[in-house]
Amino acid sequence: MSLKNKRLTLFQIRPGLVQTAYANGSSTSYITNELGVPVAFTPTGVKHLHHRAVQFPIGVYFEANGHGTVVFDEKTQQLIRTKGGSKLNALMDVINQTVGDAISDMLLVECVLADRDWDCDQWFNCYKDLPNRF
């Protein structure tokens, strides 16, 4: 299983993910080791996550409370607009890069799952959360 999109690989675009210390360690391990995506950590708060995410060509951030989004730098947006194909363009249009939006984020998840021909069970079984120590 790989996150690598052939077009992103072709364009040498490296996405990055930003989490806080509240993220489940299993997700961090899966993202780093299985998907090969670098993970950065920030203090809690969207302002910290967003500031770090914009330092990646494609930055993904989310907090355990559900806040988050995907951001694209200008060069990546231009590359996707001109050479990315209809699917990547459509995904970029769905995303609210400014503040995130739970509805558009879920629509994005649905689009990715449909493209991979996955159901929710397959998605949920990608990795197992580490148990809460409290």
Where do the model's predicted regions map?
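Phosphate-binding and adjacent anionic-ligand microenvironments
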Residues: 1-134
